[in-house]
Curated annotation (Swiss-Prot):
Any one annotated GO CC term: cytoplasm
Species: Bos taurus (Bovine)
Protein name: Kelch-like protein 21
Task of the protein: Substrate-specific adapter of a BCR (BTB-CUL3-RBX1) E3 ubiquitin-protein ligase complex required for efficient chromosome alignment and cytokinesis. The BCR(KLHL21) E3 ubiquitin ligase complex regulates localization of the chromosomal passenger complex (CPC) from chromosomes to the spindle midzone in anaphase and mediates the ubiquitination of AURKB. Ubiquitination of AURKB by BCR(KLHL21) E3 ubiquitin ligase complex may not lead to its degradation by the proteasome.
BTB domain sequence ranges: 35-103
Limits of the BACK domain: 138-239
Keywords: Cell cycle, Cell division, Cytoplasm, Cytoskeleton, Kelch repeat, Mitosis, Repeat, Ubl conjugation pathway
Entry's Gene Ontology BP terms: cell division; chromosome passenger complex localization to spindle midzone; proteasome-mediated ubiquitin-dependent protein catabolic process; protein ubiquitination; regulation of cytokinesis
Record-linked Pfam families: BACK (PF07707), BTB (PF00651), Kelch_1 (PF01344), Kelch_6 (PF13964)
Kelch repeat residue intervals: 287-335, 336-382, 384-422, 424-463, 464-512, 513-560
Record PROSITE patterns: BTB
Name of the coding gene: KLHL21
Subunit structure: Component of the BCR(KLHL21) E3 ubiquitin ligase complex, at least composed of CUL3, KLHL21 and RBX1.
Record CDD domains: BACK_KLHL21, BTB_POZ_KLHL21
Length: 597
């Protein structure tokens, strides 16, 4: 039997070598052997060491000993501003890799580690100080962390402050620099039970020193999310505040908030705006609501489901109280949802149902002037428009009444509509023809006109359409392609295709993104996929699944109240009107979205 050939190379490594080497160096230091430099700390105390160890442990010493300065050759180096006990700890760490951080040494050790460039020790001190955060030191700790570029500690301090802002003393908050206060007010994580508390925080800061701070009031008010301040408070306190009444920029912000609450502000048509995003602590969230549709067996659904993108969870809302039928249209007006028309196959409906999100209830409102199916509905300037081939009418929710308008100049079958830049657009094929056109309604003139928008994309039939950030998006029913029209520039464009087709699916805008759900996919299987398009990244991603595969459903987005995310306990400061809305020690009922409107 042949013996195996001897190995030419035997790879070997000793896992304990690094630790053994450290121990050896530490022993040489203790025996004062081969020492080639002495560090002199503040107060004149000497620390003998090895240059190679210091240079390997710290970029500061590496640069010092490798450069052309006098210290590179000196046997004695004086370190200004480094306490001897802190230098002792850092030298011990260089030879052992260990250091004991405590409440007595954490801050001075961090300063020394920052100066002498021991990043691991600096990070350990920051982690220790994070555990020491409390109401008495959080503001100073954030100052300290930012002064020494401790990102982790600075971030932890800010999170602590935002979460406990209602428990901080008034004097602490009033001493904040402007930039810091603006940062807190603009942060989604500012933990207030109601937006009125954020407004009061800004107002109290200005009132603490009016001569110096009044000029900053418009900037502060812009950082408050006035649209989510309750209407009675907006009228009784914000509008009556002299700082607001005498300031045109503040009055514009107030008007914006009132338009939003009266459903006259289309947040989807405008560009992204933080003021239109409620803080999670208030319990309000923008949600996707699905109404009706058909299931796998083509059975009609009367369920109403809502999806909260913050939690990724679905919840049931009040079921539709009647037979939905087919051919109905769904639209959101403010925080309410309207379902118009439809048919049961033999009879057209003129009925209109309103979902009141504040009480989770469906009620019937004034019927349309004409019964219809396969029409389209959109909201423009706080009014609900219903558009069909031969007629157009408009609903005013403040008077619960309908008004007949001029019909389209060129009747279109089964059109899609969307409001954009103050006008209503309709897209579809001319009645009895295959020619696709786009028409525009001018509300100030009660007039329809044909839009000369060049060659339309090759749609087989009217695509689903929504408006986002001043652009009109068109989702094809038989393709994953997505077209975009800019009415201001009169230009067409494409965005990346969806991950799949959604034949019979639904389209909505939520949180500055397009949401497409359900329908039949590329394999003709009924899908439960919900995918979203983010204009900032120009990418589609699957964000969830429907409760069950569904098609021919409607979807819209509204704001709805969920459980507030404010921490319990602690004191706060009183709001105008005598109620301590920052005092979260007592449970409170959730905010009613109807109060906004």
């Amino acid at each position: 039997m042949e013996r195996p050939a001897p190995l030419a190379v035997l790879p070997f490594s000793d896992p304990a070598h690094a630790l053994s080497l450290l121990r050896g160096l530490s022993q040489l230091r203790a025996e004062r052997k081969f020492l080639d430099v002495t560090l002199e700390a503040a107060g004149g105390r000497d620390f003998p060491a090895h240059r190679a160890v210091l240079a390997a442990a710290s970029p500061y010493f590496r640069a010092m000993f490798a450069g052309q300065l006098r210290e590179s050759r000196a046997e004695r180096v004086r370190l200004h501003g480094v306490p001897p006990d802190m230098l002792q700890l850092l030298l011990d760490f260089s030879y052992t890799g260990r250091v004991a951080v405590s409440g007595d040494n954490a801050e001075p050790l961090l300063r020394a580690a920052d100066l002498l460039q021991f990043p691991a020790v600096k990070e350990a001190c920051g982690a220790f100080l994070q555990q020491q955060l409390d109401l008495t030191n959080c503001l100073d700790m954030q100052d300290f962390a930012e002064a020494f570029s401790c990102a982790g500690l600075a971030s932890a301090a800010q999170r602590f402050i935002l979460r406990h802002v209602g428990e901080l003393g008034a004097e602490q908050l009033e001493r904040l620099p402007l930039a810091r206060l603006l940062r807190y007010l603009r942060d989604d994580g500012l933990c207030v039970p109601k937006e009125e508390a954020a407004y009061q925080l800004a107002l109290r800061w200005v009132r603490a020193d009016p001569p110096r701070r009044a000029a900053h009031w418009p900037q502060l008010l812009e950082s408050v999310r006035l649209p989510f301040v309750r209407r009675f408070y907006l009228l009784a306190h914000v509008e009556a505040e002299p700082l607001v009444a005498r300031c045109p920029p503040c009055l514009r912000l107030l008007r914006e908030a009132r338009d939003f609450q009266a459903a006259r502000y289309d947040r989807h048509d405008r560009g992204p705006c933080p003021r239109m995003r409620p803080r999670p602590s208030t319990g309000l969230a923008e949600i996707l609501v699905l109404v009706g549709g058909c299931d796998q067996d083509c059975d009609e659904l009367v369920t109403v489901d809502c999806y909260n993108p913050q939690t990724g969870q679905w919840r049931y809302l009040a079921e539709f109280p009647d037979h939905l039928g087919g051919g109905y249209s769904i639209v959101a007006l403010g925080n309410d949802i309207y379902v118009t028309g439809g048919s049961d196959g033999s009879r057209l409906y003129d009925c209109v149902w309103r979902y009141n999100s504040s009480v989770n209830e469906w009620t019937e409102v004034a019927p349309m002037l004409k019964a219809r199916e396969y029409h389209s509905s959109s909201v423009l300037d706080g009014l609900l428009y219903v558009v069909a081939a031969d007629s157009t009418e408009r609903y005013d929710h403040t008077t619960d009444s309908w008004e007949a308008l001029q019909p389209m100049t060129y009747p279109m079958d089964n059109c899609s509509t969307t409001a954009c830049r103050g006008r209503l657009y309709a897209i579809g094929s001319l009645a009895g023809k295959e020619t696709m056109v786009m028409q525009c309604y001018h509300p100030d003139m009660d007039l329809w006109s044909l839009v000369d928008c060049g060659q339309l994309p090759p749609w087989s039939f009217a695509p689903k359409t929504v408006t986002l950030n001043g652009l009109m998006y068109f989702i094809r029913d038989d393709s994953a392609e997505v077209d975009v029209y800019n009415p201001t520039k009169n230009e067409w464009d494409k965005i990346p295709s969806m991950n799949q087709v959604h034949v019979g699916g639904s389209l909505a805008v939520l949180g500055g993104k397009l949401y497409v759900s359900g329908g039949y996919d590329n394999t003709f299987e009924l899908s439960d996929v919900v995918e979203a398009y983010d204009p900032e990244t120009r990418a589609w991603s699957v964000v969830g699944r429907l409760p069950e595969p569904t098609f021919w459903h409607g979807s819209v987005s509204i704001f709805r109240q969920f459980m507030p995310q404010t921490p319990l306990g602690g004191r706060g400061f009183e709001l105008d009107g005598g109620s301590s809305d920052m005092d979260v020690g007592q449970p409170r009922p959730p905010q009613n979205p109807a109060e906004l409107h």
